[in-house]
Amino acid sequence: MNKVSARPQSTTELRVEAARDQLPIIRAVARTLAHRRGFLLTEIADITRAVDEVGAALIDAATLGSPLRCSFEVSGSAFLLTTAVTSHRGLPRYPGARWRSLEALTDRVLTTDLLGESSGEREVVVAFIKQRRGRR
């Protein structure tokens, strides 16, 4: 009989002003969580760069005064970051270099653009998954 044991899922939520000077805080949380779960240094570097790409995209799209909401979930060998802002513009229809870079750094990128609470507002959500390949 095989015994399967898994670490419990860990979720951390963070809400900051949608401004570029907040990116170091988000990066620090992502790095710390990935490090604590045994991601390799190269994987942590990829996660950190992906956080920058997602954060910059959402900050550019955010409505003035909209917070940037982040949910970090680490379960088993997967690191999932889900981010969201309120926007009047939404995400670009045809993502360019920023999105190609994000896809190269991560294993999966998910985006959605939902109707917001007020007229003309959109709830823009971007998430990515990074799998841990090796062990330190």
Positions of predicted regions on the chain:
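Conserved beta-strand-loop-beta-strand hairpin that lines the nucleotide-binding pocket
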Residues: M1-E13, A57-R136
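Bergerat-fold GHKL ATPase/HATPase_c domain
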Residues: M1-R49
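Conserved ATP-binding N-box helix of the HATPase_c
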Residues: L40-G65
